[in-house]
Amino acid sequence: PAAIVLDGVIHLFYQSYGQFPRDYICHATSTDGVNFTRDPSNPVFMPTGAWNCGRAIDADVVAFGDKLLLYWATRDPEMERQMLGVAAAPLESDFSAGCWTQLNPDASILCPELPWEQLCIEAPAACVHDGKIYMFYGGAYNCCPQQIGCAVSADGVRFTRLFDEPMIRNGGPGSWNESESGHPYIFEDDGAYRLFYQGSDDHGKTWRLSRAEIAFDGNGLPYVVQ
């Protein structure tokens, strides 16, 4: 799930699951972070277009200008390749089902192209830095191994990869993340960027969480602070 606090209200965006390919993005709100009220219009978003199967999972949201951008993962109609899309709603809206406009009606905003990405780009994790959106993502399906890449966009729709190789790799034999470093989430904490991600050393039987600090060099390239 993805959460954002706006005007003292926590907006939680989560997915239905187990109805594959009919899993969609839902919305709930809370003022205390514990007790949530489901949006009566759920699901609030499902993608359209011949390029995808109609599924949407792995929600992430980021405020950008006067819009809330909702990133999600979907698959092609053959249910083989996983890729990303984006929708937008006015920040002053209630984010219910009628508020969202899909910004990529004809194609994905990021699909697997590099060898290490294999057949999957998923788990979008977006943050705003210096007026641009940086998108961290999981490349390859779970434990294949999944690793973390990064792309950047000036408008939140058209993304350019920053690296041809993973920014955060899986570990070597015997390490805690031998099978995967994946499913990132980026959080800005008073100007510091914290990237949380999962790892496994037994092909997904056991999962662990880790955190890396991300900084940006003079050219706007993100890097892991050692």
Where are the language model's segments positioned?
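Beta-rich carbohydrate-recognition and catalytic domains
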Residues: 2-54, 62-119, 127-177, 188-226
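Catalytic-core region of carbohydrate-active enzymes that cleave or remodel glycosidic bonds
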Residues: 183
